[in-house]
């Protein structure tokens, strides 16, 4: 899956992964990340999610990373925000109070960019990637995060043979495999969500689960 794929999805407004509401799992479980006002949270492959503004409204410093320039521009335009724009190590950096978005390749992210980061929130990053990229993504994320970190991860699982992703099925054992090295993993929620996901129903998917994990290292 190449960068051109995601640029085309945004250019053609094929963004079914974008939610027009704050993610309810985030609202329910943000407190489990034990963040204090002013601490930084990373949102990888963030798109233009409404969760960015909501997290900032909770008093957090939000750092999003997104490949698509259109997604980043749309986020600020739709929130009537006027960011300062400059360059940072190959990224185009957009900044307003409480929110910094780095537009560019996630795999160019370096540990020094996350030196102040306390936690991450992944709702649509891991499940957006095919298997060969998921392992690379999870490895890079762990390499650049500070040693002591927490994470809130949302995944879906379904019979992958019944539908081509994205979003892709990421079963529980895969999550635990990616984060086996020094992370404590707690499943916070798991439920059947097939009935409220028409895209999966239309394609004949027989079951669909959504799960939420708390990850902690250090």
UniProtKB/Swiss-Prot annotation:
Cellular component GO terms held in the UniProt record: cytoplasm
Enzyme Commission number(s) of this protein: 2.1.1.67
GO molecular function, one term: thiopurine S-methyltransferase activity
Main localization (coarse): cytoplasm
Protein localization: Cytoplasm
Gene3D superfamilies the UniProt entry points to: Vaccinia Virus protein VP39
InterPro entries noted in UniProt: SAM-dependent_MTases_sf, Thiopur_S-MeTfrase_Se/Te_detox, Thiopurine_S-MeTrfase, TPMT
Keywords for the protein's UniProt record, in alphabetical order: Cytoplasm, Methyltransferase, S-adenosyl-L-methionine, Transferase
One annotated GO biological process: response to metal ion
Binding site for S-adenosyl-L-methionine: 10, 45, 66, 123
Catalytic activity: S-adenosyl-L-methionine + a thiopurine = S-adenosyl-L-homocysteine + a thiopurine S-methylether
Pfam families, sorted: TPMT
PANTHER family per UniProt: THIOPURINE S-METHYLTRANSFERASE
Family, as annotated: Belongs to the class I-like SAM-binding methyltransferase superfamily. TPMT family.
NCBIfam families registered for this protein in UniProt: PRK13255.1, TMPT_Se_Te
Protein name: Thiopurine S-methyltransferase
Biological source species: Pseudomonas aeruginosa (strain ATCC 15692 / DSM 22644 / CIP 104116 / JCM 14847 / LMG 12228 / 1C / PRS 101 / PAO1)
